[in-house]
Amino acid sequence: MKILVKIRLTRVGTHKKPFFRIVVMDAKTKANGAYIENLGHYDPVLGQVVLKKEAILAQLQNGAQPSETVKNILSQEGIWKEFIALKDANKKRKAALSKAK
């Protein structure tokens, strides 16, 4: 049985000073519950984003679903476009292997 995981934001900032971690967690876990892996952080006040690119790509390739906000952040950083390119390359490679057989 495969566990459905999501990449989403969890708030760790104080009152009127938002700060978010970008984490991988089970889809059924509460928003501020336990997470599997920390993939970076986002500070909307300063507009600062720090991401672990390789870890994010690995989680996406394993089937993790990003939330809309995280997907927008990944698009702005160029990681989402890279993931789509990797996904298309894998499809083409699998198609070529199946034709070769």
UniProtKB/Swiss-Prot annotation:
Pfam families: Ribosomal_S16 (PF00886)
A GO term for molecular function: structural constituent of ribosome
Protein's GO biological process: translation
Keywords on record: Ribonucleoprotein, Ribosomal protein
SUPFAM superfamilies membership: Ribosomal protein S16
Ribonucleoprotein in keyword set: yes
GO cellular component: cytoplasm; small ribosomal subunit
Family label: Belongs to the bacterial ribosomal protein bS16 family.
PANTHER family: 30S RIBOSOMAL PROTEIN S16, SMALL RIBOSOMAL SUBUNIT PROTEIN BS16M
Entry protein name: Small ribosomal subunit protein bS16
